[in-house]
């Protein structure tokens, strides 16, 4: 039986994907005659405590050989998630979502399709669309000021830049992350020409605020740069110098918790006798929840006593972060292009909305990104479905589902599985959000992509097993080919590709701390750099990569073939994971060869007499 309905196919659903509130949706069913007489109804329900299913009778549109066609138009005015299927009267059969998103006939309840309805006025920064990101873990990128003194005596300087980050537990079984390789803001500034050559438009920096660990996710002072990285003036200079290369800087904001070793909490006493832990009358006391029922006597992030949680609904904390002259306002006016919110799915929607207001108050072109690991439209938290991607909160999110789909594909899983996972996110996310989603293969929180592709899974084996592991020989060579394919996909999907520092030279490592090694500036691994630079150049030159629609033409086995369709140009991408050359038909009717473990990109001008440009990047 042929497909009865597929929301990815424009024949069955228009427009594709999420819609603005008040926008019309057209749905079509294709019913085989073998099903007999049917009177199909759309059954759709908005997710909400008091919402009930609504039935729409579908009109008969005519026949084709052995098939009847029915359609319905509807307008969804209320923002939220809607779930739908089709009833086939007069009996109790229904059409539900089956494998590969195709509608199948069932006598029982089944999976439903989703429509995301977002705020009619939702916009994301135009200046970010079509651009390329580069993520830097500041302590491990480049040391611009050498032989600088440690600003605090409990920091350990690592002079050997090839050394492995500390991983062995201390005498109490903990990890203090006290080893510093000396990367700083001046070092980033020194490497701006290199980043420009790589086609980078924006830097995403892991936290730079004063904090007493090398990762700096335990903020000690929100308003000052960590002294080992430089000064506030150094940050402003970096922003100005980066702008000369067309590069903006997005900062990491950690607002769900602070450090216990901070001027706000001050458990360790580094900041005198003030702070919420030591002084019951501290102005910061109301930020935290002190109660004997908690380990250590206060609520902390996932039980880590060095990370006391803040109450993001406390008015003084909200004002400190989002008010005029507050944290957001201060850093954007110092030159930052936006913020990435750490653990955004653990922040209340109302707090995120106030952060958005603070960001957009400086400029609508400032960017607000959130860390969410799953489909951000279906995430639950605080007892309800989260709404931060529906137009009043985040501009977009980190796109972990794309990462997982792409890495699984280049490692050997079927292309149709990757295509389905990618299309699901594209369908669920508002267009302004999917066009600014951060697409990556590695981060400071995950194994490096080359390790995932070429080495064994850790499978729960600890740091002692992970330490010192690096693939070489044939495994390394094949891994680099697969990494090249993976980045070709990441650079050509909807959203903003993000290169994690060192991936371009094949750096390896399992999770923290092994994925946070110092950048090997003396590396001789050069083969991926020109490929990434060419992909960035292609993104900049072809408008289809800015906001073009995604259309999958073929996803079968080791072949992934898709288009990005823009207003004036169409880009066609064919990725061949197999070990032999394939000859693939293009949408234009022509054919192209694609090398084993390779990819080809064809850009075509839309119109009757198109020009073709072929990019077979070796």
Task: Give residue spans per PLM region.
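Conserved, mostly hydrophobic/aromatic
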Residues: 29, 136, 195, 205, ...
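Surface-exposed beta-strand/loop patches in extracellular or lumenal glycoproteins
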Residues: 28-32, 42, 577-588
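Aromatic/acidic polysaccharide-binding cleft in carbohydrate-active enzymes
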Residues: 139, 382-383, 435-471, 487-525
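Active-site-proximal helices and loops of the catalytic beta/alpha 8
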Residues: 239-248, 256-257, 262-273, 327, ...
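Glycan-recognition and catalytic regions of carbohydrate-active enzymes
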Residues: 424-427, 500-501, 505-571, 577-580, ...
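C-terminal beta-strand-rich structural cap/linker in extracellular carbohydrate-active enzymes
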Residues: 31-33, 132, 592-618
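Substrate-binding/active-site clefts of carbohydrate-active enzymes
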Residues: 137-201, 208-334, 355-361
């Amino acid at each position: 039986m042929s497909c009865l309905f597929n929301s990815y196919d424009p024949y069955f659903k228009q427009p594709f994907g999420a819609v603005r509130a008040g926008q019309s949706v057209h749905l079509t069913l294709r019913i085989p005659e073998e099903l007999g007489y049917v009177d199909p109804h759309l059954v759709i329900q908005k997710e909400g405590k008091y919402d009930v299913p609504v039935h729409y009778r579908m009109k008969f549109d005519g026949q084709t050989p052995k098939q009847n066609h029915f359609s319905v138009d509807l307008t969804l005015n209320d923002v939220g998630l809607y779930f739908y299927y089709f009833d086939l009267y007069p009996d109790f059969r229904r059409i539900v979502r089956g494998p590969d998103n195709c509608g199948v006939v069932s006598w029982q309840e089944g999976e439903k399709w989703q429509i995301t309805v977002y705020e009619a006025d939702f916009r994301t920064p135009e200046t970010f669309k079509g651009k390329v990101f580069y993520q830097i873990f500041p302590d491990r990128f480049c040391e611009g000021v050498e032989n600088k003194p440690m600003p605090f005596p409990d920091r350990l300087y690592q002079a050997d830049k090839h050394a492995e980050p500390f991983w062995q537990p201390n005498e109490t079984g903990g990890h203090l992350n006290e080893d510093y390789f000396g990367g700083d803001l001046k070092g980033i500034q020194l490497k701006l020409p290199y980043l420009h050559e790589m086609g980078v438009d924006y830097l995403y920096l892991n936290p730079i605020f004063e904090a007493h660990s090398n990762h700096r996710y335990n903020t000690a002072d929100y308003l000052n740069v960590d002294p080992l990285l430089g000064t506030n003036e150094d940050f402003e200079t970096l922003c100005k110098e980066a702008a000369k290369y067309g590069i903006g800087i997005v900062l990491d904001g950690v607002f769900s918790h602070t450090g216990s070793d901070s001027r706000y909490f001050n458990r360790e006493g580094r900041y005198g006798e003030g702070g919420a832990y030591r002084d019951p009358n501290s102005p910061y006391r109301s930020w935290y929840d002190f109660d004997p029922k908690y380990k250590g006597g206060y609520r902390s992030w996932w039980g880590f006593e060095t990370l006391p949680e803040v109450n993001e609904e406390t008015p003084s904390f909200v004002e400190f972060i989002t008010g005029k002259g507050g944290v957001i306002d201060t850093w954007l006016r110092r030159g930052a292009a936006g913020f990435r919110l750490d653990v955004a799915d653990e922040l209340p929607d109302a707090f995120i909305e106030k952060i958005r207001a603070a960001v957009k108050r400086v400029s609508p072109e400032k960017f607000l990104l959130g860390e969410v690991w799953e489909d951000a439209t279906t995430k639950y938290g605080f007892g309800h479905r989260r709404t931060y991607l529906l137009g009043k909160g985040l501009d977009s999110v980190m796109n972990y589902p794309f990462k997982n789909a792409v890495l699984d594909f280049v490692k050997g899983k079927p292309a149709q599985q990757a295509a389905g996972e990618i299309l699901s996110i594209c369908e669920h996310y508002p267009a302004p959000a999917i066009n600014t989603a951060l697409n990556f293969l590695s981060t400071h929180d995950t194994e490096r992509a080359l390790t995932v592709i070429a080495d064994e899974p850790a499978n729960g084996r600890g740091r002692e097993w992970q330490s010192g592991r690096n693939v070489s020989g044939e495994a390394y060579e094949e891994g680099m080919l697969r990494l090249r394919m993976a980045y070709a996909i990441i650079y050509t999907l909807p959203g903003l590709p993000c290169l994690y520092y060192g991936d371009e030279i094949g750096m390896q490592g399992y999770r923290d701390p092994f994925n946070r090694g110092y950048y090997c500036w003396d590396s001789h691994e050069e083969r991926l750099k020109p490929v990434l630079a060419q992909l960035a150049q292609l993104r900049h030159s072809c408008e289809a990569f800015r906001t073009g629609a995604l259309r999958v033409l073929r996803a079968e086995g080791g072949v992934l073939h898709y288009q990005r369709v823009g207003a004036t140009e169409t880009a066609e991408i064919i990725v061949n994971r197999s070990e032999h050359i394939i000859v693939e038909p293009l949408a234009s009717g022509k054919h192209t060869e694609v090398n084993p473990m390779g990819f080809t990109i064809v850009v075509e001008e839309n119109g009757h007499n198109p020009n073709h440009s072929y990019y077979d990047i070796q």
